[in-house]
Design a protein with these regions (language model features):
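Membrane transport/envelope proteins' first extracytoplasmic loop
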Residues: 2-261
Length: 261
């Protein structure tokens, strides 16, 4: 019985070899494609995790409607499990490029101690061209293909508020000279995000020395977690490590709110 089935099978293949070969080729291509996708996904995760570690991407981003004071930052730094802390400012404003109104996200970067061994230098910039800001009134632009050639080194960007407030309420200067083009791990894709300013979509991101911001309160705080860099960003152990510190920081925040009252 078994030999008969085998003979019939080979007879069918021989009688319609073209159809058999086509089906075989389709299956082989599908299996090869699936195997390649399966292998490449793990490689991509490994590469991105290494990139995040190299440029010290934040593990936690803290936001507060009331802002952060120096006392708040001290309390965050003293929370068990916290490794690096960078208190910064961020604001969405407007500018004009050509004849178009453009929404600009302005982010603060450390003015001093940008060394790679400084754990508080979080979301480190990778310079593509030019240099980093060294004085007030200078900025670097996040490089993207869309604005390549439209905003370049040597250009001056004039900023204005997107609401009834004056720009001086947010920034000490309204003009910034572009001195460099950079990549940042904070934005892994070309999409920067949404905004309540302008058209609703952020078109361009610039970084200035954090001291260029006006106001007494930090708008956001980036935190790295002790031991998290040794773990794979996409694994459960990483999320467990970060979540433990997240809970502690929540308790720290509650205490700081009570202290302000």
């Amino acid at each position: 019985m078994g030999k008969t089935v085998i003979k019939d099978t080979f007879r069918e293949i021989k009688g319609s070899f073209g159809r058999f070969f086509a089906i075989f080729a389709i299956v082989a291509i599908g299996v090869s494609f699936f195997a390649g996708i399966t292998a490449s996904s793990s490689d991509m995760r490994y590469s991105s995790d290494s990139y995040y570690d190299e440029y010290n991407l934040f593990d936690l981003r803290l936001l507060s409607d009331a802002g952060f004071t120096d006392d708040d930052i001290k309390a965050i730094r003293e929370t068990d499990g916290v490794k690096g802390v960078f208190a910064a400012h961020e604001a969405d404003v407007l500018t004009t490029i050509g004849n178009a109104q453009v929404t600009v996200r302005v982010m603060g970067v450390p003015e001093k101690n940008r060394a790679d061994d400084n754990e508080d230098y979080i979301n480190r910039l990778r310079l593509k061209e030019g240099r980093l800001p060294e004085r007030d009134g200078e900025c670097v632009v996040r490089y993207s293909d869309f604005y390549d050639g439209k905003v370049d080194i040597g250009d001056t960007i004039t900023l204005r508020s997107g609401d009834e407030k004056d720009i001086s309420d947010t920034l000490k200067f309204n003009e910034y000279k572009v001195v460099g083009l950079v990549y940042t791990p904070y934005y892994a894709s070309y999409d920067i995000g949404q905004s309540s300013t302008g058209s609703g979509k952020v078109n361009i991101c610039i970084m200035v020395n954090d001291d260029c911001f006006a106001g007494d309160y930090y708008t956001e705080t980036f935190v790295t977690v002790d031991g998290a860099k040794q773990l794979n960003t996409y694994k459960d152990k990483y999320f467990s490590c970060v979540d433990d510190v997240k809970v502690r920081l929540g308790n720290t925040g509650t205490k700081q709110i009570e202290a302000r009252r």
